[in-house]
């Protein structure tokens, strides 16, 4: 799927039976959630449910990658269908139907990162300084770049904590990292969005975010 499919109103309705707004700042996440809802709906027609494990939309592109685990049974199907609905974004647009459940699975992402670490060369067992590693196996520059991109995507997704509300708010000229730290210090949950480096999601009310932004 291309997230740009979710921008023209007619295309979104025709392909996914959903509504979205090309003017909404959460357009990339909306596209991801519409695709996840379409996946859950397709599974439900065959008596199956889905667990969304990882979603990724590479910066600078309009493509979406979704990894899910299919589960058999009517109970799993009903549980997935219950996570599909409509929602209002912080920009005031009503969108959907879309997936309202988590977009990342922390246990799955930790296993992915552990697998990435396992692909690194082991420490030198024949002496040498602590932490010294054997020369890495030859790898093409393209393969190395893919490995770096995969690790970064997993790390960003893991940091975008499950359990926070859908959708994010733009941080303007303020540092997203600084605002996340300020919100956490004030007792709120917050994380940077994995879909836009200048946006964050939080359980804090909008007024609180605005006050911190102006401080």
Kindly label every feature range from the protein language model:
Residues 1-215:
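SAM-dependent transferase fold signal centered on methyltransferase-like domains
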């Amino acid at each position: 799927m291309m997230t740009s499919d979710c921008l023209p109103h007619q295309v979104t309705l025709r392909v996914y039976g959903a509504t979205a707004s090309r003017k909404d700042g959460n357009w990339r996440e909306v596209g991801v959630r519409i695709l996840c809802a379409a996946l859950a709906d397709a599974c439900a027609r065959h008596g199956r449910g889905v667990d969304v494990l990882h979603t990724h939309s590479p910066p600078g592109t309009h493509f979406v990658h979704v990894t899910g685990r299919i589960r058999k049974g009517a109970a799993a199907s009903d549980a997935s269908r219950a996570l599909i609905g409509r929602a209002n974004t912080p920009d005031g647009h009503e969108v959907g139907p879309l997936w309202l459940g988590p977009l990342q699975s922390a246990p799955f992402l930790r296993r992915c990162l552990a697998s990435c670490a396992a692909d690194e060369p082991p420490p030198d067992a024949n002496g040498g300084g602590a932490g010294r590693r054997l020369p890495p196996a030859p790898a093409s520059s393209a393969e190395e770049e893919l490995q770096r991109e995969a690790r970064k995507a997993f790390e960003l997704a893991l940091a975008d904590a499950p359990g926070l509300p859908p959708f994010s708010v733009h941080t303007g000229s303020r540092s997203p990292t600084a605002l996340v730290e300020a919100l956490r210090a004030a007792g709120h949950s917050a994380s940077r969005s994995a879909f836009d480096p200048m946006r964050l999601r939080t359980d804090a009310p909008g007024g609180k975010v605005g006050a911190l932004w102006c401080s």
